Structure formats: structure tokens, C-alpha cells
Amino acid sequence: MRIKFLALSLGLAILLAGNMSSVADASWLSKAMDRLETSNAKLSPSWPKAEQYRHYRPGQVIGAYLPAEDMKIAGVSLGTSFDAVKASLGQPTSEKRDELTYGGIKFGHSLMQDSRPIVWYITVSNRDAVTARGIAVGDNLKKVMDVYGRPDFIDFNNRWFYGYLRYNSDNIRGIFFEHNGSKVTKLIVSDN
């Protein structure tokens, strides 16, 4: 009887240890892949770097306007009224005078630009939404380059920008991809 108990206990311990190690291995492997992607990005001579985007004159036009479809998130485009956003997406999870929040998606309005609440920028901080071309928070930067090409600009916060801007001004219309060096951490669609 005692031998059966020991054998059963040992079998259970091995089973539990085997399951725990595979979880640890998966976590370790995921972290190792993230480190590898980040180091490859830093070492690659073709990888865009912020210092390559500092030679412009103030006011110089950089990039080009993106198609209207690219300037939408969750079916909402810039310039849409807050009332139309609520009619389309329902009640927001949070509502402020200058911002509607739906989970990880925020539709913002700059009160200085217009007294009516119109969407002037959209941010996405999780995988609740994707760009029109299918990029989401958590996707790697290689995928962004494969889909959008080289950034039109990299700002002083190291965000990749695609679209139209005038250097050293607030005249910006396009998409920013904030990242941690290997993966997208936030999307910003803006028309300033």
C-alpha cells in the first residue's frame, strides 16, 4: 500500500513539474524572441533610425497624405462628431468633455481647435482595434515596415510616422506608431 502511495505521489509530482516547466519554457522562449527581435532591429543597417530624419528645414513638407481609409479606426474617421461616434459604437466606457473612450480606443478633441466635439485624434493602447492595413498594438516593427514601408519620419520620441507633416510645426496628418524598440505599444491617428 505504501509503495502504491509513493508511486502515485511521484507520478503526480512529475506530472505537475512537467506542466510547470513547459509554462516557464514558453515564457522564457517568448522573452528570448523579444530580446532577439530588439537586438536584430538595433543592429540592422537597413532599420530606420531617428538621426536619419533630422536634416529637414523648418516648414519643409515630409511625406504625403494617407488615403482616407487609413485615417479610420473602428470605422470612425477624423472629423466625425462625438454624437456620430456614439451612434456608431454605442455608449463609451468613459466620457469626458474632450474625449470618448471605448476600452483601449480613445477619440479625442482639442477644445482650442473647435467648440464642437469633433474627433481630431484617435489613440489605440491595446488590441481592441487595428489600422485599416491590419497593424495592431503588439505587432512587431518588421510587420509595420512590411505593410507601410520605411517611416516618412521618426520624431524625437522615436515614434514612427506615416503621412503628411511640415517639419517643426503642428501641421501633421497621419499615423504614429509608438514602440518599445521591437513591438508597437500605441497607435495614434492625428490631424493637427
How would you label these PLM feature ranges?
Residues 36-43:
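Amphipathic, non-transmembrane alpha-helical stretches in extra-cytosolic proteins
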Residues 24-34:
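Cleaved targeting-peptide boundary
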Residues 1-26:
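Sec-dependent N-terminal signal peptides of Gram-positive bacterial secreted proteins and lipoproteins
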Residues 133:
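Glycine-rich loop/hinge motif
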Residues 32, 44-72, 77-118, 125-127, ...:
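A cross-family detector of function-defining hotspots
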